[in-house]
């Protein structure tokens, strides 16, 4: 059976792995998932990630980050879903926790944070909030 929302599955795997204090989490890979992982790494929410290809299937392995025994990601929440897509213009991109968190946005110029999208002057689909 096919998965209806692979990005929500990725976020749930990260959330569940951090609740049981796993070092890393593995999931099926895609270009969008790798782009989201890159944003999470650039923002300091994860330590590292790697894509392992075996034949036709590739897997994304994310090394999770903890500080003082607690997960760095306190909240990770899907915003735009397959049943209800959420698009925002460059002036309407939300601010998460007054700038302490980030909104990950898929724009025509690639997947980026809300701050970078505002600075670049582009809007797009709000994928998730991370805090």
Curated annotation (Swiss-Prot):
Molecular function via GO: rRNA binding; structural constituent of ribosome
Gene3D superfamilies in alphabetical order: 3.30.1370.30, 3.30.1490.10
BP GO annotations: translation
Entry GO terms, CC: ribonucleoprotein complex; ribosome
UniProt keyword annotations, A-Z: Ribonucleoprotein, Ribosomal protein, RNA-binding, rRNA-binding
Pfam families in the cross-refs: Ribosomal_S8
Signal peptide region: none
The keyword RNA-binding belongs to this UniProt entry's keyword annotation: yes
InterPro entries in the cross-refs: Ribosomal_uS8, Ribosomal_uS8_CS, Ribosomal_uS8_sf
HAMAP family registered for this protein in UniProt: Ribosomal_uS8_B
Family affiliation: Belongs to the universal ribosomal protein uS8 family.
PANTHER family: 40S RIBOSOMAL PROTEIN S15A (PTHR11758)
Physiological role: One of the primary rRNA binding proteins, it binds directly to 16S rRNA central domain where it helps coordinate assembly of the platform of the 30S subunit.
Subunit structure: Part of the 30S ribosomal subunit. Contacts proteins S5 and S12.
Protein name in the entry: Small ribosomal subunit protein uS8
Organism: Paraburkholderia xenovorans (strain LB400)
């Amino acid at each position: 059976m096919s998965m209806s929302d692979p990005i929500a599955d990725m976020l749930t795997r990260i959330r569940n792995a951090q609740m049981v204090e796993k070092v890393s989490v593995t999931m099926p890979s895609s270009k969008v998932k790798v782009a989201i992982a890159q944003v999470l790494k650039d923002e300091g929410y994860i330590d590292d990630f790697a894509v392992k290809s075996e034949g036709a299937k590739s897997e994304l392995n994310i090394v999770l980050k903890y500080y003082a025994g607690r997960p760095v990601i306190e909240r990770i929440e899907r915003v735009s879903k397959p049943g209800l897509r959420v698009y925002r213009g460059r002036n309407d991109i939300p601010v998460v926790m007054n700038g302490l968190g980030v909104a990950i946005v898929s724009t025509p110029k690639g997947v980026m944070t809300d701050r970078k999208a505002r600075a670049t002057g582009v809007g797009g689909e709000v994928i998730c909030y991370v805090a």
